[in-house]
A protein has these predicted regions:
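Extracytosolic ligand-binding ectodomains
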Residues: 1-389
């Protein structure tokens, strides 16, 4: 290992070691190593000399995860953290279930949850419900949605429709786009730019032949406008981050969607990019994600330990390690049962509070963040307990 400490220690927790399944080789090896580093840092900071962590390479494939799980079980693992990908978690499920070993996967694909597999990734449905509830609290009533074509886009569209209904709002327009395509035509149609521009031209034509004061005042008001009227939504949800939101945001401004009249909304997919405020069209946009307050300290400590900045997902491995250590009774025996994992009071980590549900999905306390030029700022604090949630 290249880390400053070894997580494979002698002893163990009641003779029940915890297996960590990560892609340490293959296409996701850099991310896998970062998650391993985060897990090591958690153990180092806790200072628990009696904890045994067994590390296995999944090679970033379902077949590799299956082999790793079999080896972990044969080595006596009583609890599995990982694997990272949904297909890998699906491959591990029957192997772990056969011997009654529970799994906490770092995937956010809730389709693989259940039957002993708990997904620990940030679930988009919950984020969408949180940000749409915030939009309702801010007195928005009509939501537009831009989502990619595909399974993820279908899922977030369905989630947004349900969330809007529950919040008493209406999804008034849905736009879908192909990943990697030129988005100009899609955004122009979604913004109803042509019809709004035609409305402006028609209004100017109607006023051109009039000389009364009201007509003159109206013409002055229309000066400098590109379109007339607003699009059919007062908030716009774009549940995709990375290059997609950076490509979409300036096009929204180009096609005259005024951020002062249409609130831009997002999800934790935006949380990978702390420099979103560099894009002027995104300043003032809001999204639902774990509070960054505790994670900021984690990021600093990680960088001090390992001399590189952690990827966003690294905190999942850190918190999962804290979870594994916490699942012990006062008698130092491990309780990795489904009942212990489903503790209604939940757990806490650098990404805030979380708990697992009976179906293997997770629930988190999410904050509302606002994009600023200096970086994201907490607008609405994340809950500190699940009381009332």
């Amino acid at each position: 290992m290249t880390s400053p400490f070894d997580i494979n220690r002698p002893g163990g927790v009641g003779g029940d070691p915890v297996a960590l399944l990560l892609p340490l080789t293959g296409r996701a090896s850099v991310l896998g190593q970062a998650l391993l580093d985060a897990a090591q840092m958690a153990l180092f900071e806790i200072g628990d000399e009696g904890f045994t962590f067994l590390v296995y390479d999944t090679q970033g494939t379902a077949a590799g995860a299956e082999d790793a799980a079999r080896l972990a079980i044969s080595d006596g693992a009583a609890f599995i953290l990982g694997p990272l990908f949904g297909q890998s978690a699906q491959a591990v499920k029957p192997i772990a279930a056969t011997v009654g070993v529970n799994v906490v996967s770092f995937s956010n694909n809730d389709a693989v949850s259940g039957e002993g597999v708990n997904v620990f990734g940030l679930l988009p449905d919950e984020q969408i419900h949180r940000i749409i509830a915030h939009a309702a609290a801010e007195r928005h009533s009509r939501i537009g949605l831009l989502a990619p074509v595909g399974i993820y886009g279908d899922r977030v569209t369905d989630a947004a429709i349900v969330a809007a209904q529950q919040a008493g709002l209406e999804i008034t327009k849905v736009g879908r786009y192909e990943l990697g395509e030129d988005l100009s035509d899609t955004i122009r149609v979604f913004a109803e730019y042509n019809s709004r521009r035609s409305s402006l031209a028609y209004q100017r034509k109607q006023l051109a032949g009039r000389s009364d004061e009201i007509a003159k005042q109206t013409m002055r008001r229309l000066e400098g406008l590109e379109t007339l009227g607003d699009p059919p939504y007062d908030a716009l949800l774009v549940p995709e981050g990375g290059a997609a939101i950076r490509n979409i945001a300036p096009l929204l401004a180009f096609y005259d969607i005024d951020p002062k009249r249409v609130q831009l909304l997002g999800t934790a997919a935006w949380d990978d990019d702390a420099s979103l405020g560099d894009e002027p069209a995104l300043v003032g946009a809001r999204y639902a994600a774990p509070s960054p307050i505790l994670r900021h300290g984690f990021d600093q400590r990680f960088k001090q330990f390992f001399k590189y900045a952690p990827p966003r997902l690294a905190s999942l491995a850190y918190d999962a390690t804290l979870l594994a250590v916490s699942l012990r009774t006062a008698g130092e025996t491990a309780d990795f049962s489904a009942e212990a994992l489903a503790d209604a009071a939940g757990f806490a980590g650098v990404d805030g509070i979380f708990r697992f549900l009976a179906n293997g999905q997770n629930q988190r306390g999410l904050a509302i963040l606002e994009v600023r030029e200096s970086g994201p700022e907490v607008l609405v604090a994340a809950p500190e307990s699940f009381a009332g949630l």
